[in-house]
């Protein structure tokens, strides 16, 4: 079979794992796998990055037997919609990773359930009652599912998600760093802080911990990724 894969290089660790899986599958099944990887900057909207995303247009959809679509790596709304339309119009089989999309097969985790388990652990094992949350890009599927899980479990347990400590980043290091600097300033100003912070991914959580290291906030706020 001849398979096309579409991805944006926004998350090195996630993509490396996916590439290793593709490599192993190719060795086992001897399929021809073509990777279309764009490196456009998320949310930029400028002409340079729009041209980067136009790279996906080079794929001749009729030349392939099927597609692999790690949709959560493609977060530019118009780019994502255009690519989806081309995949669906081709009438070729396609597997979506991490996001359930009508008409496509799906492989992924239950994003909401995983976040509910994090809340349950923090509350049950560590006695946390107030939470902050740093999420991914607000309009994306996985961010919505993760927030749904956090909010529903907190409500169920009668706990508090502090609205002033719910922020949206882009899963990159700087998002966690920015959130941490905001919290350091609030702590120094004597403002109320959550007892724990839930991060939507490990990189933002690591950035948070690294940023508060050596400050008065170090060791005072547990964070999960």
Predicted regions mapped to residue ranges:
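Bacterial carbohydrate/catabolite-sensing allosteric modules
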Residues: 1-44, 50-225
């Amino acid at each position: 079979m001849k398979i096309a894969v579409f991805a944006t290089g926004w998350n090195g660790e996630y993509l490396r794992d996916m590439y290793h899986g593709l490599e192993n599958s190719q060795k086992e099944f001897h399929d021809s796998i073509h990777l279309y990887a764009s490196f456009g900057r998320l949310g930029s909207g400028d002409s340079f990055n729009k041209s980067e995303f136009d790279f996906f247009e080079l794929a001749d959809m009729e030349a392939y037997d099927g597609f692999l679509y790690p949709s959560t790596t493609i977060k530019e709304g118009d780019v994502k919609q255009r690519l989806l339309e081309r995949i669906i119009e081709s009438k070729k089989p396609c597997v979506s990773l991490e996001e359930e999309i009508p008409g496509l097969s799906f492989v992924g985790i239950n994003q909401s359930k995983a976040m509910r388990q994090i809340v349950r652990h923090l509350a049950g094992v560590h006695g946390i009652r107030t939470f902050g949350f740093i999420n991914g890009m607000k309009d994306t599927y996985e961010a919505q599912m993760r927030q749904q899980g956090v909010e529903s479990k907190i409500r169920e347990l009668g706990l508090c998600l502090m609205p002033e400590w719910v922020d949206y980043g882009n899963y990159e290091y700087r998002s966690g760093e920015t959130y941490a600097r905001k919290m350091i300033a609030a702590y120094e100003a004597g403002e109320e802080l959550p007892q724990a912070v839930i991060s939507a991914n490990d990189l933002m959580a690591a950035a948070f911990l690294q940023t508060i290291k050596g400050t008065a906030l170090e060791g005072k706020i547990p964070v999960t990724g």
